[in-house]
Amino acid sequence: IPVEWLPDNHFLSEPGEFSDWLAGRKVPIMEHWYRKIRKRLGVLMEPDGKPAGGEWNFDKLNRKAFKAKGPEVTFEPIQFEADDITTRVRKDVAQYLNLVGEDALDYWPVNREQARQVLNDFIEHKLPHFGDYQDAMWTAEPWLYHARLGSALNLKLLHPAEVIHAAESAWRSGHAPINAVEGFIRQILGWREYVRGIYWLKMPEYENENYLGADRKLPWLYWGGET
């Protein structure tokens, strides 16, 4: 049976683009790939071909820690009323899966309208703080300034281009600083596309690679809920 392999239009790299880029390179450095695809798509680029803000990567500004009192401002995440499908899924998870903790299904968008709400909420409230504290953690604050858009992207409720455009527009309008916007866009245009490229290029052998030789079982403290 003849099969036609169609490209996934919910990614921004073209078929064969990653493998062509990697050909002849000894090390697949994500930063180099990220710059290449930014140039091609014109994301965070100026008319003269230079990166917006004068630098390609502002990660050095994105490593702040909270002071002793913790985050100065936090935002309650949007929650959604469970529909019939979510309710059934919750029952199935409780019945058939022995998982640690409690489900958080009410916090995750399950349709396009909800996904757009989460995106707009992130751009309006959290993106301005995302860059400074994207690596920070604080007790009893599981969300902080993160977007919660990973599942919406992977389930194709949002297109990566619309998410990137929303973030870039926030910087160009003065709503969010460049380090926050560039750091966020790098997660989607850089890491998301890069990891997909590695997956398609290296699998299935890649699944069994173990460069660090990790073969010990995780200790009990990973499962006990106490540290």
Can you describe what each PLM-predicted range is?
Residues 1-108:
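Beta-rich, aromatic/charged-enriched effector core domains that present basic-aromatic interfaces
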